Regions:
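Hydrophobic alpha-helical segments
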Residues: 1-260
């Protein structure tokens, strides 16, 4: 289990069906595996929130800071970023069993399979659905199109084809170009960004790959780019949410819905 959690935390795109099968063979029932995945993904969300806005201990502590594991480029190396690793397992049923819910089917205009695979934990499923909707609603500091672009970019960095599929649909509905969507889905920021938008995509990449490397100077850069603290909080929540969603989809092998 610890090996599974470590991989889900550090390299979620490398998870394959046999990782889940190993948990099942070790005696973990599917609802427990779901609980493990949700817990790990949730703490990845919380870690990014804490690191992204500089939350520190409220009291004196002797706990040492954890040294950062970095490659020479400051991000995961090419081998760990190979998007073809999961290609052979990109179709079929999710890696754990689940029961489809008529309520979910009736009420969902979005990532149905993501919610169905969470059906063993209805409270978490319903909260995830509401939280996703909240994160994609535009605000003064982060309008809806930009939020979807950032979500697709983060999903591209994590090689999460499932989340990328749905974010791509949102952007296509906003008449976004195919070329830009393809670029974002491959983990590349839009070309020719102004400094304001560039600071957003740079920070999103940092929170995706190395959230603990965030420093106050990075927050100051966002402020200089025109974001107030509420906007920075919104950006941090958005990046943290897609860290959660990507990990749930990747860890459970959630398949893309078949269009009829």
């Amino acid at each position: 289990m610890l090996e599974f959690v470590e991989k889900l935390t550090l390299y979620p795109w490398l998870l394959v069906r046999k990782d889940v099968t190993a948990l099942q063979d070790a005696g973990f029932p599917d609802p427990t595996i779901l609980h493990i995945v949700l817990g790990c993904a949730h703490f990845n969300y919380l870690n990014r929130m804490a690191d992204g806005i500089g939350i520190r201990f409220e009291y004196q502590t002797e706990i040492p800071e954890v040294a950062q594991r970095r490659s020479d480029s400051g991000s995961p190396g090419p081998a760990s970023l190979d998007p073809t690793v999961r290609e052979s397992e990109s179709s079929g049923l999710a890696w754990i069993g689940f029961q489809e819910s008529n309520n979910v089917v009736a009420e969902t205009d979005g990532p149905l399979n993501l919610y169905c695979v969470m059906s063993a934990n209805p409270a978490a499923r319903d909260l995830a659905r509401e939280w996703r909707s909240y994160q994609l609603k535009g605000t003064t500091q982060l309008e809806g199109r930009l939020r979807a672009q950032l979500g697709l970019y983060i999903s591209g960095l994590n090689h999460c084809e499932y989340s990328a599929y749905w974010l791509n649909k949102i952007l296509k509905g906003l008449s976004e170009s195919d070329s830009l969507c393809e670029r974002l889905a491959s983990g590349e920021p839009p070309p020719g960004l102004r400094s304001r938008e560039q600071s957003l995509f740079t920070h999103a990449r940092r929170l995706t790959y190395e959230p603990a490397s965030t420093k106050e100077e990075h927050i100051q850069q966002l402020r200089r780019s025109g974001f107030n603290d509420q906007g920075i909080l919104q950006l941090t929540m958005l990046c943290s949410y897609f860290s959660f969603e990507n990990r749930v989809a990747l860890a459970l092998g959630v398949p893309i819905e078949r269009e009829t």
